[in-house]
């Protein structure tokens, strides 16, 4: 059959049919009858359109070899044979310019004379049966249907055959010729039956003996035999009478399926209230590093030694003072805590041998900041179960917060490139198989795009801090250990650099369960003045601790240096996941890989190299109020990585709930965009489930805002 198709049809038609089948994941060499059917249908569509024009008076005329200078317009726009995206673009354009309703399914042609879409059918069965199937599927009076058969019969909507007798006769003759050619090669019966689905191998295949008994034993309840079950499955229509199926499930279920249209969805309601505040475990875009290059000091690699060396690079220390107090805290204690850290670091330097770790003195300011002796005493339930009014500890509802612009700025900054490399190319052995070669090529390209990304810096910073804190929590349970916040990178010139962001002081950490909390005080350097966005720093007490000279285009300028101090807490399970933040690199690489795979399957070759090296091509990155944002493949890699990193940094029950529930609405909207006629019940219930997760979390609120932008542009 494949040879016949390639001999019988124009090469352009054969190529289009192959492309169409590949787009749907079908193989022309295997599904040869389908290959022949698609070629036949394409040829009929082209013949339907051939020689039909509209002259300058708007009249329909037939021109087979006329004056090339005549002002003629093709009567039919051919939609069949284009790839799906381009076909829908053509359909949308026609609808916008002519005002006709957009069809739910892709039609084959548009008739500019009659101003209507046309669906062409070619059948090996009775024309009226096929016509009814088409009409039931399309469910539109706007689209004209015209069916041809291989026996010379035809059927059209309202018996309106559109074309003149001679044009239709040409199509019927061609179909009859194809049928005769197939019959002479012994291909016709197989081709005819493949549409009707007559005797298939499965129906002739008898299951006997043990397999038959196993099949009968494996039936779902209420089915007496395999035939009984098969008949039910064959007659089952998955989209039919959902209401009826729901009512069979439970007497309480009473759902009416409502059609989901472009006008159905509303935007998510974001909460009102004061702007949301920063809640990450460490500073992100506002962090400041004290750095040493090519470290070679004694004890290099020991955090405390590295930290002291970094501190010595800065000479602008000043007497600290509070410039943005924490509203609920005892702010002088935060000031005293920083002074204590400075004093104890000075003490270390005065010693003959610097210790590897430093445990802070248990001063009143640190005991207050770390919540020492503040936890309510735990009492065994057995000792108090007889108390009449025993009740759970009452906690207030969280205060609603509104979206603030700082979180979008944080995200934008996380997508940017820094001047340092934060990850090395993994040293993995030689590739031994072709698939390994492709995998390492993809990994290398991806690493090159993200190694300098600020989100990658956040990963390495998060891994370091969580590892150090978990180690200290286990090794020094009763001590207030001082933990430097350190990261390592390479400069553009390839020199090693060690960075100090600040310090953590860990509280008591007898962590028995995964969720037991260890308190810590973080003290982080910054050049950001907290008075510019005070709402962002609600949970912080900010000190001014020095002046830093910065090189700018106009020379050196002096800027105040701040210390952001806050009490925070984490648990074993959170630290365990924090230590594994490198997984974010893997997740975003897999997302990029699925994009490469989709491209490669269409082109039938590995597209990794073209994907990363074609710098002129842009890709969709995300939605914004302006529309779909596009960027280079590197920008896509960095954006996907930043999203994954922020999901880790801002992980919360609100994010889990929002992601799970909003995904359902996203799938419904996607089905509508794919013209699948989705139906819903209790849509307001779904909105309620999504919106109850919009409370005060900055990352969730930003995602909800992005979701609203997506809804606006997806349903235009």
Swiss-Prot record:
Gene Ontology molecular function, alphabetical: endonuclease activity; metal ion binding; RNA binding
Record localization: Host cytoplasm; Host nucleus
Subunit field text: Influenza RNA polymerase is composed of three subunits: PB1, PB2 and PA. Interacts (via C-terminus) with PB1 (via N-terminus).
GO CC term (a single one): host cell cytoplasm
Motif (Nuclear localization signal 2 (NLS2)): 184-247
Annotated residues for binding of Mn(2+) 2: 80, 108
Entry annotated with the keyword Membrane: no
PTM note: Phosphorylated on serines and threonines by host kinases, including human casein kinase II.
Residues spanning the membrane: none
Note accompanying the cofactor annotation: Binds 2 manganese ions per subunit.
Keyword Ribonucleoprotein: no
Motif Nuclear localization signal 1 (NLS1) location, chain numbering: 124-139
Cofactor: Mn(2+)
Superkingdom of origin: Viruses
Described purpose of this protein according to its UniProt entry: Plays an essential role in viral RNA transcription and replication by forming the heterotrimeric polymerase complex together with PB1 and PB2 subunits. The complex transcribes viral mRNAs by using a unique mechanism called cap-snatching. It consists in the hijacking and cleavage of host capped pre-mRNAs. These short capped RNAs are then used as primers for viral mRNAs. The PB2 subunit is responsible for the binding of the 5' cap of cellular pre-mRNAs which are subsequently cleaved after 10-13 nucleotides by the PA subunit that carries the endonuclease activity.
Organism: Influenza A virus (strain A/Hong Kong/156/1997 H5N1 genotype Gs/Gd)
Binding site for Mn(2+) 1: 41, 108, 119-120
Keywords, sorted A to Z: Cap snatching, Endonuclease, Eukaryotic host gene expression shutoff by virus, Eukaryotic host transcription shutoff by virus, Host cytoplasm, Host gene expression shutoff by virus, Host nucleus, Host-virus interaction, Hydrolase, Inhibition of host RNA polymerase II by virus, Manganese, Metal-binding, Nuclease, Phosphoprotein
Annotated protein name in UniProt: Polymerase acidic protein
